[in-house]
């Protein structure tokens, strides 16, 4: 993908941290509301039934993985992808989200006076960077467009709930006020002893079932390691004009198209796919050797070990092997090295 797309869907280690580790919850300032009792199964069904609910709102992401805040650092030459990915998992970020339906969504990430937009409207996907004055327009059938990263609490919750199985204890633990709404709090606790994840808490809107916040807390910690929550939300259907995008005359536009019926070339067919070792919360994703990770920031954030380099955080670890493989999981670096040695 081109570099402005990579600012949204980077192709290195860090996006897997977001996808694998998932996301966080709010501290509740208001008194807990009194709500009718619901079982975990009833709440899971409520969340599932909320898919496609129109809404708009402001979300705040806060990360405390033990990494330095790199948001003020300029991307290094040739390192836009890694630098932008690292920005997303350090410090705090604010975004505005608009969902009109299954094929109309807009996410607007605010970076000071600049913004990055991802706008999907049917068969059209626009990726816009106001600072770089660049936009990419992708056209494809709705089911042929690439999946967006897990940005909102709902998207993060969907990934987590899809993975709920016998490796997880699920319980309703409390009620809360989130973005002015009454919510149930559903806690997922891993049974796997080797995972770094202590618990995950979902804040579920009591009326609509839309997830308002998701929180992941690492073992041995009391505060979430990664959090995203709504500070404002409205369930009025957003104006259709919000999903129309016309770039300004000074914006460089790159046109791309995706044809699902097109036969992939030999190189695409031969591209090795990631594999998963183990299952449950201590599963490890192994990415085969690919393009070398050369961004100097990678060296700043990793530690040299036998056979490669490791990125260790409170919630997730990555092992960059000298042979080009990348291993990621919510486990210790030593566990990743053991998998790499198999």
Name what the model sees in each region.
Residues 108, 171-251:
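Gly/Pro-enriched, hydrophobic low-complexity segments
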Residues 1-15:
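N-terminal export and membrane-targeting signals
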Residues 2-6, 21-132, 171, 185, ...:
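N-terminal mature ectodomain segment of secretory-pathway/periplasmic proteins
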Residues 130-154:
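Acidic/charged, solvent-exposed loop-and-adjacent secondary-structure segments enriched in E/D, K/R, S/T
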Residues 242-325, 330-341:
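Accessory, solvent-exposed terminal regions and/or long lumenal/extracellular loops of proteins
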Residues 141-142, 189, 218, 333:
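A generic structural motif
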Residues 126-136, 215-227, 231-244, 326-342:
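A short, surface-exposed interaction/processing loop segment used at functional sites
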Residues 34-49, 62-64, 69-78, 147-152, ...:
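N-terminal low-complexity, Pro/Thr-rich disordered segments
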